[in-house]
């Protein structure tokens, strides 16, 4: 199933990539077509206007030419029947020619008048500029003539007096600033001392609180370590007994899977491995048993493991307790009699004699 999904995903990704590539290519071609069509439009317009202008010029030249009039005269001489009509036409053509001549003359007169007006304006501008230059020269000469040595001395005296006044004002401001700065410095030092004392007190209080919390946490950790060690010992003994006794085969399949999941949680924690393939049936069943427990704590998993073992094999846990007690007794007997205990030395001697008599030592 997963292989089929992967193949389907690759096919969909390939189709999407090809579609995007085709879309980009089509957009690029459309932009190129638009950019190639844009510069042709003004060229077409320019060509049309030039053709129109050229046609107008040709018409005007034909009307102003003299060869046409000569040809008309010859035609009039050859044809006698239409003398009146041809004469009328010649008269009209003459009027048109004279009208065009008048129009040309008017245009030349207007252009000459415009040129003369422009020249007049330029001349006026030149005159105005010259007048402004003369006025500026006269003003400079008057200012130079008005500057006398007496006026210069008076201006220097005034400037010196103003400089002295400004220096006195600055010195007064500096003195005021220095006096005010001393006061501000003293006040700021007092504020800093107060803040530093408050900060020291707060830091001391925080350090004391942290020490208290650390002590309480260490005490809790010590107690938790003792409890966990006992639970872990019982769990390890049950697991070893279950493996050595060979009674795991007597347990049902569901209970066996549940024991496997609890053992995984107690030893490795919550399940973080990937799901195995559907072909691996046993591995998938074990993974499901492990995943089903979720985020169960290791202590809870150990307790449930012991409870399930005692339920499925009742005598196994009792044997485990007896074995644990025997190991504890062996460790207690192996200790020396004066290993830091606060018992009476006479009792220690009597206990040693009793133990030697039991073991058959004279």
Curated annotation (Swiss-Prot):
Pfam families: ACBP
Record keyword Zinc present: no
Cellular component terms (Gene Ontology): extracellular space
Disordered, as annotated region: 132-151, 193-214, 329-362
Domain ACB: 231-318
Keywords for the protein's UniProt record, in alphabetical order: Coiled coil, Lipid-binding, Secreted, Signal, Transport
Molecular-function annotations in GO: fatty-acyl-CoA binding
Principal subcellular localization: secreted
Coiled coil: 192-221
InterPro entries the UniProt entry points to: Acyl-CoA-binding_protein, Acyl-CoA-binding_sf, FERM/acyl-CoA-bd_prot_sf
Signal peptide region: 1-22
Tissue-wise expression: Expressed in roots, stems, leaves, flowers and siliques.
Binding site for an acyl-CoA: 260-264, 286, 305
Compartments in which it is found: Secreted, Extracellular space
Protein family: Belongs to the ACBP family.
Function: Binds medium- and long-chain acyl-CoA esters with very high affinity. Can interact in vitro with arachidonyl-CoA, barely with oleoyl-CoA, but not with palmitoyl-CoA.
PANTHER family: ACYL-COA-BINDING DOMAIN-CONTAINING PROTEIN 3, ACYL-COA-BINDING PROTEIN, ACBP
Protein name: Acyl-CoA-binding domain-containing protein 3
Protein source organism: Arabidopsis thaliana
Gene coding for it: ACBP3
């Amino acid at each position: 199933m997963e292989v089929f999904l992967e193949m389907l995903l690759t096919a969909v990704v390939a189709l999407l990539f090809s579609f995007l590539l085709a879309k980009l290519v089509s957009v690029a071609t459309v932009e190129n077509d638009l950019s190639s069509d844009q510069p042709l439009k003004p060229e077409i317009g320019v060509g049309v206007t030039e053709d129109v202008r050229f046609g107008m010029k040709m018409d005007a030249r034909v009307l102003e030419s003299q060869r046409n009039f000569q040809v008309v005269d010859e035609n009039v001489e050859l044809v006698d029947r239409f003398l009146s009509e041809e004469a009328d036409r010649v008269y009209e053509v003459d009027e048109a020619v004279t009208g065009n001549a008048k129009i040309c003359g008017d245009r030349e007169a207007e252009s000459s008048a415009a040129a003369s007006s422009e020249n007049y304006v330029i001349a006026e501008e030149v005159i105005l500029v010259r007048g402004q230059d003369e006025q500026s020269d006269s003003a400079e000469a008057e200012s130079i003539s008005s500057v006398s040595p007496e006026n210069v001395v008076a201006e220097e005296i005034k400037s010196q007096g103003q400089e002295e006044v400004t220096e006195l004002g600055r010195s007064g401001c500096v003195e005021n600033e220095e006096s005010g700065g001393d006061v501000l410095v003293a006040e700021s030092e007092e504020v800093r001392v107060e803040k530093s004392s408050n900060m020291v007190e707060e830091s001391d209080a925080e350090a004391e609180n942290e020490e208290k919390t650390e002590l309480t946490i260490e005490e809790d950790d010590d107690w938790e370590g003792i409890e966990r060690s006992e639970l872990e010992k019982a769990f390890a003994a049950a697991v070893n007994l279950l493996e050595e006794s060979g009674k795991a085969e007597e347990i049902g399949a569901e209970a066996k899977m549940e024991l496997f999941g609890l053992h995984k949680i107690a030893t490795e924690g919550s399940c973080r491995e990937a799901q195995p393939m559907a072909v691996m049936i046993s591995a998938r069943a074990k993974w499901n048993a492990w995943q089903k427990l979720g985020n169960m704590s290791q202590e809870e998993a150990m307790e449930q493991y012991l409870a399930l073992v005692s339920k499925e094999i009742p005598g196994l846990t009792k044997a485990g307790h007896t074995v644990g007690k025997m190991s504890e007794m062996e460790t207690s007997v192996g200790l020396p009699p004066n290993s830091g205990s606060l018992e009476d030395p006479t009792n220690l001697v009597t206990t040693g004699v009793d133990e030697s008599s039991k073991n058959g030592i004279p």
